[in-house]
């Protein structure tokens, strides 16, 4: 934990250095991400395998090893205890109900001149969902992104999530089954975003990429936007809490921890009075 005091003579220098460091890091990362995207776009599965071995530590030699069979997702769901399964299914049902109210429908009418006017609304054909799987696994990210796509009528939902230490979190697999994911790949980072954006022989190109990720994922989504749609640039997480002494410090600490856990680039700041 780093502590800055506005009473210190070098406070302005410290705060400026803190902000500048983030900008410098972002520039360097953007160049590395661009190289990864170019490699996957140009060499497809071969580059995807190389980056998955080097960055995710997954021992893969064939593109087919990257895909998770639907039966494996279903088995993970069946293996959950009753409470875990009920929690996932209840969450999915609540998200599904909310998304149904959000769903936009087409309409048309005929004006007084005999012209037929209206709006045609069609679901996307294919959507890619990114679910973090490095330092922590987030089955909630699977549900919050895949279930609305299913409600919208998307034909094919592709989930990508890195396998931490060669293992996919069973709750992520189970959430994929609950959410109706059609295909899943154990790939992550900028290379996964590139594969979804441009496609490879194994991973189909999608119309839109959704879901949160670390700085690499955020930078990659920013760079492929235009080639493919994205939801937003989510991450790295930043939160600033202004403490006025009116709240239980434990609550503040929990809020800070909730953001700081996302990745090493997350920033959880507390502004307080001396």
Where are these regions (language model features)?
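Conserved NAD(P)+-binding/catalytic subdomain of aldehyde/semialdehyde dehydrogenases
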Residues: 180-269
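N-terminal Rossmann-like NAD(P)+-binding subdomain of aldehyde/semialdehyde dehydrogenases
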Residues: 1-125
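Generic structural signal for well-ordered, non-membrane alpha-helical segments
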Residues: 8-11, 26-33, 41, 48, ...
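N-terminal small/polar loop signature for handling phosphorylated ligands or for N-terminal nucleophile
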Residues: 97, 169-180, 197
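Terminal amphipathic helices with adjacent charged low-complexity linkers/tails
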Residues: 56-57, 272-274
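Conserved small-residue-rich beta-alpha loop and adjacent elements
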Residues: 109-174
């Amino acid at each position: 934990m780093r502590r800055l005091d506005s009473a210190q003579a070098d406070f302005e220098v410290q705060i400026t250095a803190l902000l500048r460091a983030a900008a410098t890091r972002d520039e360097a990362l953007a160049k590395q991400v661009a190289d990864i995207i170019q490699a996957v776009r140009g060499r497809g599965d071969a580059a995807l395998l190389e980056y998955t071995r080097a960055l995710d530590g997954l021992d893969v030699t064939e593109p087919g090893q990257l895909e998770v069979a639907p039966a494996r997702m279903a088995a993970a769901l069946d293996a959950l205890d009753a409470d875990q399964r009920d929690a996932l299914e209840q969450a999915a049902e609540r998200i599904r109900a909310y998304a149904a109210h959000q769903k936009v429908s087409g309409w048309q009418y005929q004006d007084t001149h005999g012209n037929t006017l209206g709006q045609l609304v069609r679901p996307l054909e294919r959507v890619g969902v990114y679910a973090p799987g490095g330092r922590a696994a987030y089955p909630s990210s699977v549900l919050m992104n895949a279930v609305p796509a299913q409600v919208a009528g998307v034909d094919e939902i592709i989930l990508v999530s890195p396998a931490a230490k060669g293992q996919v979190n069973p709750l992520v697999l189970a959430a994929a089954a609950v959410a109706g994911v059609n295909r899943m790949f154990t790939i992550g980072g900028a290379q996964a975003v590139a594969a979804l954006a441009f496609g490879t022989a194994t991973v189909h190109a999608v119309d839109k990429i959704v879901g949160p990720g670390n700085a690499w994922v955020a930078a990659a989504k920013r760079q492929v936007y235009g080639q493919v749609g994205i939801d937003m640039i989510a991450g790295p997480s930043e939160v600033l809490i202004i403490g006025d002494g009116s709240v239980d410090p434990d609550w503040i600490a929990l809020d800070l921890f909730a953001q700081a856990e996302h990745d090493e680039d997350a920033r959880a700041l507390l502004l307080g009075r001396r």
